[in-house]
């Protein structure tokens, strides 16, 4: 399904609302724009990642006193996410440390990851999966800031 109608988008937004919108998550307008874009795959999501020095798990989480770094916490999420991406026909295209910004404004990015999905439906199927959602606690604990650019490969 390349194009989502308003009712389908509203249902999905209600489903995902429990995790929150904005900050390190897309806001409702961004997610609605993606779903209603009519774009279909393959699509590459370019993830710019900046980590907390120390992971910020909720107090009641078993890993709260663990002393994990933000990057280590995000790595736990990354393992879960990659499994879900691959199961849906996607792939990890690139995963690199950022060394410096050579041109442009300095940004706080620590790493870049590019995930390729066969289409928007594969991405939506993943983010609806309860097992994937259970891994979001590690993403939330590790990420200080992020930007995700949705792109279409030209080559």
Where are these regions (language model features)?
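Short S/T/G/P-rich N-terminal loop/turn motif that feeds into the first structured element of a domain
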Residues: 1-110, 118, 122, 152-155
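Short amphipathic alpha-helices in soluble, non-transmembrane regions
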Residues: 126-131
């Amino acid at each position: 399904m390349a194009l989502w109608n308003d009712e389908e988008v509203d249902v999905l937004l209600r489903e995902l609302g429990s995790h929150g919108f904005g900050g390190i998550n897309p806001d409702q307008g961004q997610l609605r724009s993606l779903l209603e874009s009519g774009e279909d795959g393959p699509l590459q999501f370019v993830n710019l990642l900046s980590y907390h020095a120390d992971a910020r798990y909720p107090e009641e989480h078993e890993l709260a006193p663990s002393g994990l770094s933000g990057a280590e916490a995000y790595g736990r999420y990354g393992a879960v996410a990659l499994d879900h991406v691959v199961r849906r026909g996607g792939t990890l295209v690139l995963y690199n440390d950022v060394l410096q910004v050579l041109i442009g404004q300095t940004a706080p990015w620590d790493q870049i990851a590019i995930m390729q999905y066969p289409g928007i439906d594969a991405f939506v199927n993943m983010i609806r999966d309860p097992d994937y959602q259970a891994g979001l606690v590690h993403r939330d604990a590790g990420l200080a800031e992020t930007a995700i650019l949705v792109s279409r490969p030209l080559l």
